[in-house]
């Protein structure tokens, strides 16, 4: 969904005003605020979306259905003339951990007009003080938001390297053209190889994917999340009671990837044993049209015990598909596959990001201590809102 999500833009592309202002009031947002919130986003340089798509973030969210009686959709800053000058959305998500259901908040669409930006922390403070929430997770943190999170004692997600990405070039000519067309040169670590032929020769010296035991003929694609995903989720949760996992039922997956599926920008690949799923991956098209870059990202991979090796055939399959279809780049944001329970994956290229994108804060002290242990984390780009739009 092309919606209003980029924290760094929302706080860094201001509406130009210089007059002194009075402190705005803080109140709970409601669906009737949509027009003012959309206007706020637009005047701060962000894209908008239709009311139906915006409201569906909550109305169609299975976790919101469960908790809507006491779950705010967010908070707004409002002037004495009832003008909305700030907003921070509050998306609910259900996680499982050690047999318990955790209520998790994902703050989204943080934006404040420049004249009122000194009051922006009121919104974050309210998020951290809401009742009945166990954990707050952010996964699209920009550089301008990071200092505020640190001030509110948010911690970096300890698994993954969330200020880096790793990638494979799948179309050398297209990739080289997009790098040269980019003013900001986001892939400056490979700019010394701007010519596609040189890049190709370099990669031919590397083994992009080691030999795997399973044939990619075992892989199937799905046009939707079918009933097998429910049984897969219950098996996955049962096998991993000590891992913090976002709920991945058929209903939740369908909601999360609904807009990507409608745009035909998500690809679901699966492996099965008989009629039962044993592993799946979701790849998502996330292009950068201003630079002419065509890009696919791995946003989620899950497997039952004993089927972790399916990661490699999945990557090999999508690599060839990208190559065949002229996609320039296959990327993994945050390097979250670097876990001892998964087979090693070696991408030939890496790039540095402008911030550490994934932070969390536990609301109670006991959970806060537990979450310091890296072995209970198994994050991916499914968490938070990184692949929601």
Question: What is the meaning of each model-derived region?
Answer:
Residues 2-32, 198-227:
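Conserved N-terminal entry element of GNAT/NAT acetyltransferase domains
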Residues 22-110, 218-302:
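A conserved beta-strand-loop-helix scaffold within acyl/acetyltransferase catalytic domains
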Residues 79-82, 115, 172, 178, ...:
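Short loop segments at secondary-structure junctions
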Residues 111-122, 304-313:
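Conserved glycine-rich acetyl-CoA-binding loop
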Residues 2-18, 56-57, 134-200, 259-260, ...:
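Active-site/acyl-donor-binding loops of N-acyltransferases
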